[in-house]
Regions:
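Generic non-transmembrane alpha-helical segments
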Residues: 51-54, 160, 164-168, 205-215, ...
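PLP-dependent enzyme catalytic core of the Aspartate aminotransferase-like
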Residues: 209-213, 218-250
C-alpha cells in the first residue's frame, strides 16, 4: 500500500499497482485487499474490480470496517456495489449485531457458491449460536428499515466532533481531503483520526490517558488516536470527550 507520512499510516494500493502485478504473473486467480482500512480510507474498488476481471481474476475484499457503507451518499459505496465478487463484513464492529457476528457476501459467477459453503462448513461449528444469528438478522432488519437515516446521523455526529476537535491547537485530523491521493478513492468520515504528536505524546500514551479519564478510543498507534462515531452517539458524548481533552492535554 501507499504511505501517509503526515499521519504515519499505510493507506491503500492503487489500481495501477494491481494491474502491474497481474501483468507480471498471469497465473494470479484472485486479488485480495482491505477496504476501507481502519482509518476509513477506501480503495478505488470499482476500477480495481474492472482490472481484476479483465485479467480473469476474482476480487475479494476484506470490508470488516465497512458494513455500513452503501447506505448513504455521504459515505463511500460498498465493495459489492463497485463490482467485487465477494466481501467479508464484521457486522459487530459498527452495526448492532453481537460480538463475533459477521457476514460473507458473494455475487456473480466467478466464485462457486457451493464450494464456498463447503469451505465455510470446515471452519464453522455444526451447532451455531442462535442468539448470534438472531442478532445478525436484527441488525439486517434495522438497516433495511432505517439504514439511510442511521448512516446520515453517524456522519453528522462525526463531522460535529471533528469540528470541535479542530479548535484545539496543534491537533491534526484526518479528513475527506485525503481522498484522491495515496490510492484513496473515498473516506468514511465516521472514523475520526487525531494526530497528537504536536502535544508531545504518542498515540498510545494519549489513548491510555483518555482511558484513565473515562474515554475509550477505538484505536491507538504511534502518533494517532481514533474515535469511532456511530448513529447512537450524541451531545453528551462530545461534551465528555472535549472535557477530558481540556483537562488532560491543555
Amino acid at each position: 500500500p501507499q504511505f501517509d507520512a503526515v499521519f504515519g499510516i499505510n493507506t491503500q494500493v492503487t489500481a495501477g499497482q494491481i494491474e502491474e502485478a497481474l501483468q507480471k504473473d498471469p497465473f494470479i486467480k484472485a486479488v485480495f485487499l482491505t477496504s476501507p482500512n481502519y482509518y476509513g480510507q477506501a480503495a478505488d474498488i470499482k476500477t480495481i474490480a474492472q482490472i481484476a476481471h479483465k485479467y480473469g481474476a476474482a476480487l475479494l475484499v476484506d470490508e470488516a470496517h465497512g458494513p455500513h457503507l452503501g447506505f448513504s451518499e455521504l459515505l463511500p459505496p460498498s465493495s459489492m456495489e463497485c463490482g467485487a465478487d465477494a466481501c467479508a463484513q464484521s457486522t459487530h464492529k459498527i452495526l448492532g449485531a453481537m460480538t463475533q457476528c459477521s457476514m460473507l457476501h458473494v455475487q456473480g459467477r466467478r466464485l462457486d457458491l457451493k464450494r464456498a459453503a463447503d469451505v465455510m462448513s470446515l471452519l464453522t461449528t455444526t451447532s451455531p449460536n442462535y442468539l448470534l444469528m438472531a442478532s445478525l438478522d436484527a441488525a439486517r432488519f434495522q438497516l433495511a428499515i432505517g439504514g439511510g437515516q442511521m448512516a446520515a446521523q453517524a456522519v453528522a455526529a462525526a463531522d460535529r466532533l471533528r469540528r470541535l476537535l479542530q479548535t484545539f491547537r496543534g491537533l491534526k485530523l484526518l479528513t475527506e481531503d485525503c481522498a484522491g491521493s495515496n490510492g484513496i478513492a473515498g473516506f468514511d468520515s465516521t472514523k475520526v483520526t487525531v494526530n497528537v504528536a504536536a502535544w508531545g505524546y504518542t498515540g498510545i500514551e494519549a489513548g491510555e490517558k483518555l482511558r484513565q479519564a473515562g474515554v475509550a478510543v477505538e484505536l491507538t498507534d504511534a502518533d494517532n488516536v481514533l474515535f469511532l462515531v456511530t448513529y447512537s452517539d450524541g451531545g453528551a458524548d462530545y461534551d465528555a470527550v472535549l472535557a477530558v481533552i481540556q483537562q488532560v492535554f491543555t
